[in-house]
């Protein structure tokens, strides 16, 4: 059955592409595979040097020339050139990045599903996925499970980056750009020899923008503004006739905004009073007006060393990496509609918060909010005071929402030693060992807004200006041990067989750092998990064998058939301790949702099969590849977001079983010298087969997975004079309809279902049920255009990002028991100019 689905999906993809063939052709990478017959692309994604056309897997490669002509710097940009891959990044904070490859998503607050490898070194912090990694020279995106090569965080694939390596001549470059919204970018690098056999690359970058959106209440562009700078250094030295030492260091600093969300309600039985209570997420008009300026800070430092020694028959490679990423955010809260700070509880802190809430509501009565929300004469929820009450929604201009302060701090030390045959043999092999230690602290603090701003401490006593009402704060420790090996055997000159195996052991533990303290607003502990005493430490070990089998058969000199199968693995882990108690008290006991959330979430395991053909024709002027795939995922990790009277809660849950299958087709044609047409289509089908956490979702699609992606484009390089060319580049990306939650065409009870029977409206519980059929992001297309002139060592380029100003959603986070979704807008049109010089 699995094979039938795979071949059906492959055929569907081919038919769909054929229909579009009259409009445009495609290319293997959606970006570049080199200048056809003239260039041979060498890739390293499988830990060995291979010709692109010989790799027995789906892989996208962006060369240095393509990176320069597309203006690509970070993952959110190169993902748009890669079929079957989507990304959500920066909606909550800069380090909040989720990459989805063929239906396998990296759940927020869990480990990534995609390995990030930079200059041969594996990085483990998801916060680094969308960072500028230096002066890039090649990007490779390898699809399908790569756990046998890279281990625990490569279930969906691997992103392999190569940066500039110093040579024996002085070279350098600078590039600056200016665009709308006060957006400026500058980058520079210099590569110089320091002596015989030793060289240095030093690079830096700077980026600033006011962003697309404005906070109307504060009167400032503080919704998606950002400022980033970074510096990278790399020294490569020959310390012996067969030994190379590669040392790198990097520092980056980011500051800007966070939590760029509005809320949309999905309560159909309220639509008679106001149609906006049942709002399609795609129709929402975005307005921002929180009274708290949202902030986001991120500091990154990392240093690594890699040594390579070539013996007569084998090569020894060893590396070590230290990485430290500290992140924090402040923002408005979400508690106004649940009256956490509305009524005094007999403490000075609660009286002060209630007074501030009533005063700010009275001062802002009638202030225009996104419908159906409104500010009435009092902050009492509308259902309890229909004549004078309010429906605020989250992030209102009043103080009734409270505040939030979050930290995510991770330091890790990792190392690997590997010995491999020297290649170009009938039988190649490699063996290695890997170790990783992670220290991670995660804190989420909710406080009362007394109109005096946020104190950047996780716990603030009741007498302060920002007293804490709820706190999750935990210390997570992880140790990973792995052994791996692979063999590649040339069975015949046309038939290659590869076998790989990796065994990972991951020891995880968690300790609560929440102090024993009383919540001045509820009288209970500040963490619900402390209701029956201190939260005990927990530990768990996760283990997984990850095999991989691949084969390649040369049908002709220009066409290869390939197939591969492998196991992917993501370790289980711990939510903030006390999460299960919150969900049980607030939802299961109150409205009977019976959603299953645990303080421990299970490991994710996937089994994936892929088969395809890739090749070239017309003396290399036409390249193509066609692939079909099938993946079965057990215990898929999924991010859930809860809001209520308790504040907000972020957790990872498990979907018991998901099936994904689909097809992908890429084609690239050089029409004449200097004119390329390219395009690609990916079609993905998915189905939830079992989900004990939310049984009604069985039959729905895998969350965060687009039904399809289409890439179309062209590049023209035409000589204008003897010394310079005109360059035109157009890239059009269509992303298909996407569900972001397991609840899709489903009804679900909400907190309103529990509150309405006892409210002033005295309505039956079902009136508060939500309908989530209107939470699917619709398909959208984004056109990026670049036009300019380039000489041997200079370029001037005008560019348009999202040329047609297509409005779309970046992310939809459904808060199922709240009765709505938190939605974040995508980028708008931005025009600019770029100038570069190299020597």
Which residue ranges define each predicted feature?
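Solvent-exposed loop segments that connect transmembrane elements
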Residues: 213-222, 259-291, 332-405, 445-473, ...
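Acidic, small-polar-rich N-terminal luminal/periplasmic segments of exported/outer-membrane proteins
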Residues: 37-169, 611
């Amino acid at each position: 059955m699995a094979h039938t689905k795979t071949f059906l999906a492959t055929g569907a993809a081919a038919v769909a592409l054929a229909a579009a063939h009259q409009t445009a052709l495609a290319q293997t990478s959606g970006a570049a595979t080199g200048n056809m017959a003239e260039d041979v692309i060498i890739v390293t994604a499988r830990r060995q040097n291979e010709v692109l056309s010989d790799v027995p897997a789906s892989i996208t490669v962006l060369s240095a020339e393509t990176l320069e002509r597309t203006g690509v710097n970070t993952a959110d940009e190169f993902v748009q050139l890669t079929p079957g891959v989507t990304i959500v990044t920066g909606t909550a904070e800069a380090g909040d990045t989720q990459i989805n490859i063929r239906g396998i998503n990296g759940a927020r607050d869990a480990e990534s599903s995609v390995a990030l490898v930079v200059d041969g070194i594996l990085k483990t912090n998801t916060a680094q996925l969308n960072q500028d990694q230096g002066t890039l020279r090649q990007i490779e995106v390898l699809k399908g499970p790569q756990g046998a090569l890279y281990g625990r965080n490569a279930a969906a694939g691997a992103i392999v980056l190569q940066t500039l390596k110093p040579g024996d001549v002085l070279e350098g470059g600078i590039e600056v750009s200016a665009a709308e919204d006060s957006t400026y970018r500058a980058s520079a690098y210099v590569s110089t020899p320091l002596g015989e056999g030793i060289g240095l690359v030093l690079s830096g970058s700077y980026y600033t923008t006011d962003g697309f959106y404005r906070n109307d209440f504060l009167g400032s562009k503080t919704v998606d503004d950002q400022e980033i700078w970074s510096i990278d250094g790399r020294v490569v030295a020959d310390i012996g006739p067969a030994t190379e030492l590669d040392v790198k260091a990097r520092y980056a600093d980011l500051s800007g905004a966070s939590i760029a969300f509005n809320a949309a309600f999905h309560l159909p039985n309220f639509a008679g009073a106001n149609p906006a209570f049942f709002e399609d997420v795609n129709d929402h008009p975005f307005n921002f007006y929180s009274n708290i300026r949202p902030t986001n800070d991120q500091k990154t430092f990392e240093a690594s060393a890699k040594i390579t020694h070539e013996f007569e028959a084998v090569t020894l490679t060893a590396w070590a990496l230290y990485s430290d990423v500290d992140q924090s955010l402040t923002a408005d809260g979400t508690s106004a509609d649940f009256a956490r700070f509305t009524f005094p509880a007999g403490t000075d802190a609660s009286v002060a918060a209630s007074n501030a809430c009533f005063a700010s509501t009275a001062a802002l009565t009638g202030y225009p909010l996104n419908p159906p929300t409104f500010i009435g004469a009092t902050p009492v929820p509308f259902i309890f005071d229909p004549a004078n009450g309010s429906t605020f929604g989250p992030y209102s201009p009043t103080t009734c929402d409270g505040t939030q302060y979050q930290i995510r701090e991770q330091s890790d030390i990792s190392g690997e030693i590997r010995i491999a045959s020297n290649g170009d043999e009938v039988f190649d092999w490699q063996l290695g060992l890997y170790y990783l230690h992670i220290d991670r602290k995660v804190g989420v603090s909710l406080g009362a807004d007394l109109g005096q701003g946020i104190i950047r401490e996780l716990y603030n006593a009741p007498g302060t200006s920002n007293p804490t009402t709820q706190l999750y704060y935990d210390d997570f420790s992880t140790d990973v041990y792995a052994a791996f090996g692979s063999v590649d055997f040339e069975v015949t000159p046309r038939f290659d067989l590869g076998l790989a195996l990796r065994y990972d052991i991951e020891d995880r533990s968690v300790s609560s750092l929440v102090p024993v303290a009383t919540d001045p607003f509820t009288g209970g502990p500040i963490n619900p998990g402390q209701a029956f005493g201190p939260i005990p430490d927990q530990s768990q070990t996760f283990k997984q064998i990850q095999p991989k089998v691949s084969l390649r058969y040369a049908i002709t000199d220009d066409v290869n058939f390939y197939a591969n199968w492998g196991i992917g693995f993501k370790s289980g882990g711990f939510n903030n301790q006390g999460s299960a108690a919150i969900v049980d008290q607030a939802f299961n006991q109150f409205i009977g949702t019976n959603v299953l959330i645990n303080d421990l979430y299970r490991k994710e395991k996937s089994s994936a099969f892929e088969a395809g053909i890739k090749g070239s024709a017309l003396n290399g002027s036409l390249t193509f590849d066609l692939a079909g795939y099938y993946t079965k995922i057990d215990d898929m990790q999924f991010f859930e977001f809860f809001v209520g009277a308790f504040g907000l809660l972020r957790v990872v849950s498990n979907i018991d079983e998901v099936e994904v299958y689909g097809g992908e087709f890429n084609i690239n044609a050089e029409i004449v010298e200097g004119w390329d047409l390219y395009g690609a289509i990916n079609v993905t089908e998915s189905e939830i087969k079992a989900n004990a956490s939310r049984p009604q979702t069985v039959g729905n699609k895998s969350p965060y997975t687009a039904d399809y992606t289409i890439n179309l484009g062209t590049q023209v390089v035409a000589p204008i004079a003897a010394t310079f060319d005109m360059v035109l580049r157009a890239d059009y990306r269509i992303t298909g309809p996407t569900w972001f939650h397991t609840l899709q065409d489903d009804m679900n009870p909400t907190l309103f279902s529990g509150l309405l029977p006892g409210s002033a409206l005295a309505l039956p519980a079902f009136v508060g049920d939500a309908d989530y059929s209107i939470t699917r992001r619709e398909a959208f297309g984004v056109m990026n255009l670049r036009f300019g002139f380039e000489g041997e060592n200079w370029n001037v380029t005008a560019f348009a990002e999202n040329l047609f100003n297509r409005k779309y959603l970046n992310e939809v986070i459904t808060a199922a028991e709240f009765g709505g979704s938190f939605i974040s807008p995508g980028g708008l049109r931005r025009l600019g100019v770029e100038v570069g010089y190299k020597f």
